[in-house]
Amino acid sequence: ALYNLMSHVDFNLGVYYPEGGMSGVADGIAELAEELGVEFRTNHPVEWIHGYRGGFKVETGGETDVLADVVVSDADYAHTEQELLPPEKRQYDADYWESRTYAPSAFLLYLGVEGDVEPLAHHTLVLPSDWEDHFGQIFDDPEWPDDPAYYLCVPSKTDDSVAPDGHSNLFALVPIAPGLDDTPEVRDEYRDLVLDDIAQNTGVDLRDRVVVEERFSVSEFTERYNSYRGTALGLAHTLRQTSLFRPPHRSDALDGLYFTGAFTTPGIGVPMCLISGEITADSVLEDA
């Protein structure tokens, strides 16, 4: 019933689109934070977090480590615990993370193409007549789906700023099992499969119109975001991984360490992660 409410919001109440794309949400938050005195240090990957003189020292591999009273991690929860903390300060061991059920990864195909893409709307779902095989290939017998269900998004249908005149901006998102091997050869084959399927099922042939193309899949989720097994979303919303059964915002093993993001409550998705940030901020203030 809880997740049916989410479908009601999406399909009946409608959703908002940030002008310029989803990065506009992050840009807006960053702009507000800087107005409030926050300093951002980019390209400083965190390598270690440990207690230091009643607070924390965060080692970034740069010339200057960061000293802090509290630390809030929005990184992959498993990565923070397993790779950035000493063993005695971890809440969970490797067996815990290995035994969790993870939400799908994804094969994402980003395209800039010549011309329009009628009749595609801003949001289009393409579903095979029987999608059980696809979901079985995600959760039961992990492998690349041979007849996939997928989502098409065409932001240029709504926002003129994301594509030049006479062109369209779109992406295809195919849910896949986390941890799959996505070699260049596999990605090439799957790219062709997706474009063929789009042409067959929507009547929109993009194959000879591509001007710009990027691909993003398991490897990128792992390398760019340190995502456990390359999941795109974190812990799946199973009954035993919902609400209080998700990892906490406050570390039980290290006072002053907090977590936020998709692994925590309320869960996965941009709105959920923003709410998670509010919960974590309230927790920090309560403990101050």
Language model segments and positions:
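A conserved FAD-binding loop/helix module that cradles the flavin
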Residues: 262-285
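Mid-domain catalytic core of redox enzymes
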Residues: 47-164
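C-terminal segments that line or cap access tunnels to active or ligand-binding sites in enzymes
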Residues: 114-222
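Short glycine/threonine-rich loop-to-helix capping motif typified by GTGT followed
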Residues: 51-55, 86, 183-185, 217-230
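Helical element adjacent to the flavin cofactor pocket in flavoenzyme catalytic cores
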Residues: 5-58
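Active-site-proximal substrate-binding core of FAD-dependent oxidoreductases
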Residues: 50-51, 285-288
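Hydrophobic, well-ordered secondary-structure elements that form the walls
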Residues: 72, 111, 172, 198, ...
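A glycine-rich dinucleotide-binding beta-alpha-beta segment and adjacent secondary-structure elements
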Residues: 145-153, 204-266
